């Protein structure tokens, strides 16, 4: 049974992950997201998963905040990711490293593509960048 989505029960959200059923028609859901686009952003992870977060609050702004707090340049930051919700972080970091199992969209903008997590990808990237 399909349910109509409303924001009536949501108070002051910071972030949400929403899953839709396989083969479901998410167009109504996307329309609801578009209706709050002045305060919230959303990232379509895949056909059944959306990440919803406060406008201009994402992994990229988080990386910038932490780097500023630690008084280091984002040029000296290494970001590892595997999904399109990591794109903002890759754009903020000096070095964006896509895991071997990453989505194609992320691999296209990555500075380097390493092995998957299961194949010690982070270790191999550290070796590649002479960090260890």
Please tell me what each predicted stretch does.
Residues 1-80, 84-89:
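Conserved acidic, metal-coordinating active-site core of Asp-based
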Residues 63, 73-110, 115-117:
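Acidic, Mg2+-coordinating phosphoryl-transfer loop and its flanking beta/alpha structural elements
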Residues 127-132:
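Generic C-terminal helix-cap and adjacent flexible tail
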């Amino acid at each position: 049974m399909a349910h109509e989505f409303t924001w009536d029960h949501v108070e002051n959200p910071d972030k949400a992950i929403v899953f839709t059923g396989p083969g479901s028609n998410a167009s109504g859901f996307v329309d609801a997201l578009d209706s709050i686009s002045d305060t919230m952003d959303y990232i379509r992870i895949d056909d059944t998963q959306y990440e919803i977060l406060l406008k201009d609050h994402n992994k990229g702004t988080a990386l910038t905040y932490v780097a500023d707090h630690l008084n280091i340049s984002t040029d000296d930051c290494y970001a590892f990711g595997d999904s399109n919700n990591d794109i903002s972080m890759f754009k903020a970091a000096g070095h964006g490293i896509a895991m071997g199992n990453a989505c194609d969209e992320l691999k296209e903008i990555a500075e380097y593509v390493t092995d998957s997590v299961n194949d010690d990808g982070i270790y191999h990237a550290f070796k590649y960048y002479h960090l260890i």
